[in-house]
């Protein structure tokens, strides 16, 4: 029943695209005056250090250096009282020793997230790779391209867009559409997906969001219900500082239900999400809960959090060799889809933010894989350098024995390891 509904909806959205694409790109709209034009340019530099037995060291260098330049141009306009158009164009260029090393190992793109950007599974192909060889990669794409209609009580949007759900601080089991990695430092924009989005705004202050994301089978290019997503989330404000979320979805051919909450308690906020997925092998439950608190110390604004994450697909015995990973298809599929970023089953994390000055923030985070007792520490300094300029700088420091997630998991060849490298990074951003 749900699968056939997704198929019919995917077919409908394809016909709707043919009708709305000329509306977005036709000259009266695409070249109308009074567009709100803005942009940003970012340069990201990272320098990593690996042990001699790491696969990166064997393929390229023990100290790979990666450069990444990204340009985003944004155009937004409201036309009439109800309609609006959003267009974001991005162009990126990478020169990265890490990419060159990843090409030599078939397991690395899945585990490390490497690979050329593409829209093979999306409804529209809005990405073009200019060059992809050696350590270099250049590509450009439309990351947002949508038309919206708003009325009292509801908002509709069609096209490439992004939604964020979930109540986790760094782990997001309820955010099933392109969530950020727990160690991502720049969370300004999520990758967009081609979708139909409807939000019903109720008089009570509650709302119902519905999302349809049709996807293609990569091999055939055909729209497939078992590759698509249809989800609905109801947000309910109970009063007295409590919010609840109820999620129901059909996602990649599997039924999913979730519950989330956020409660004010003694000046702190307690949050949590619980997600249950029905698969062919049975049910899988993932969840996250956290508490965060803000205070003032010696004239400085501060905030801190503690979080526990249960990865229902994770490996509990700390055995991450190639055979164990291959046998856990559910985990590896979600890692390849960039829905999950961790291998273990149980994690605790904590973090603190200090406002050194109104323009200078220090962030420290610590993640522990409870199943293998490996750790990852991250320090980030965020400096509002001057008007329209920001600087991010920091380090990632893993701790753990060989064979652990953050100490470096065993590669396909005995005695070689993947991951576990220390890194420093710098990002300079200019807004215009």
Predicted regions and their residues:
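Transmembrane beta-strands of outer-membrane beta-barrel pores
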Residues: 43-49, 91-95, 151-153, 160-164, ...
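Residues that define the transmembrane beta-barrel architecture of outer-membrane proteins
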Residues: 63-69, 138-143, 150-152, 190-194, ...
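Outer-membrane beta-barrel "beta-signal"
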Residues: 383, 388-390, 395, 415-432
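Transmembrane beta-strand segments of Gram-negative outer membrane beta-barrel proteins
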Residues: 32-59, 67, 87, 206
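Residue-level signature of outer-membrane beta-barrel architecture
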Residues: 33-35, 75-79, 148-151, 200-202, ...
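Repeated loop/turn-to-beta-strand initiation elements of outer-membrane beta-barrel proteins
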Residues: 35, 81-85, 153-156, 205-208, ...
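Detector for outer-membrane/organellar transmembrane beta-barrel domains
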Residues: 268-367
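Outer membrane beta-barrel
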Residues: 76-207, 213, 400
